[in-house]
Amino acid sequence: MGISMGKSMLVLLTFLAFASCCIAAYRPSETLCGGELVDTLQFVCGDRGFYFSRPASRVSRRSRGIVEECCFRSCDLALLETYCATPAKSERDVSASLAVLPDNFPRYPVGKFFQYDTWRQSTQRLRR
């Protein structure tokens, strides 16, 4: 009861195809250059945007940009994220800038023409 040469070759090729797929899927990093690097950064960073060199606070002794990091060497997702810009505060995100007025804060208008009656009288004088 032997296995034919064709079946054993088919099993071997199937195993090799499966193994190569798994190894490629678990490869942690790859080289990215040119438009592929820019597209990947846009995908990773999204609306935040990105820098081609790291911000000054994250620079090591030897300053390298993302091209040196990812095109000439392999880079992973964590390294790509270090080049993302910090998100800008949106106009709708005002929770930190809201000032709470005390209950005893005066609520009367301050200024010459803030009171409606004063403004109305001035307007009537101009019409005359």
Swiss-Prot record:
Belongs to the insulin family. Residues 86-91 are annotated as: D. Disulfide bonds join 33-71, 45-84, 70-75. The keyword Ribosomal protein does not apply. The insulin-like growth factors possess growth-promoting activity. Major fetal growth hormone in mammals. Plays a key role in regulating fetoplacental development. IGF2 is influenced by placental lactogen. Also involved in tissue differentiation. In adults, involved in glucose metabolism in adipose tissue, skeletal muscle and liver. Acts as a ligand for integrin which is required for IGF2 signaling. Positively regulates myogenic transcription factor MYOD1 function by facilitating the recruitment of transcriptional coactivators, thereby controlling muscle terminal differentiation. Preptin undergoes glucose-mediated co-secretion with insulin, and acts as a physiological amplifier of glucose-mediated insulin secretion. Exhibits osteogenic properties by increasing osteoblast mitogenic activity through phosphoactivation of MAPK1 and MAPK3. Residues 1-24 form the signal peptide. One of its GO terms (biological process) is positive regulation of cell division. This is Insulin-like growth factor 2. The record marks 48, 58, 61-62 as: Important for interaction with integrin. Residues 53-64 are annotated as: C. Coiled coil: none annotated. It comes from Cavia porcellus (Guinea pig). The IGF2 locus is imprinted. Paternal inherited gene is expressed, while the maternal inherited gene is imprinted, hence silenced. Residues 92-128 form a propeptide. Proteolytically processed by PCSK4, proIGF2 is cleaved at Arg-128 and Arg-92 to generate big-IGF2 and mature IGF2. The gene is IGF2. It is found in: Secreted. One of its GO terms (molecular function) is insulin-like growth factor receptor binding. Pfam families: Insulin. Keywords: Carbohydrate metabolism, Cleavage on pair of basic residues, Disulfide bond, Glucose metabolism, Growth factor, Hormone, Mitogen, Osteogenesis, Secreted, Signal. Interacts with MYORG; this interaction is required for IGF2 secretion. Interacts with integrins ITGAV:ITGB3 and ITGA6:ITGB4; integrin-binding is required for IGF2 signaling. Residues 25-52 are annotated as: B. GO terms for cellular component: extracellular space. Residues 65-85 are annotated as: A.
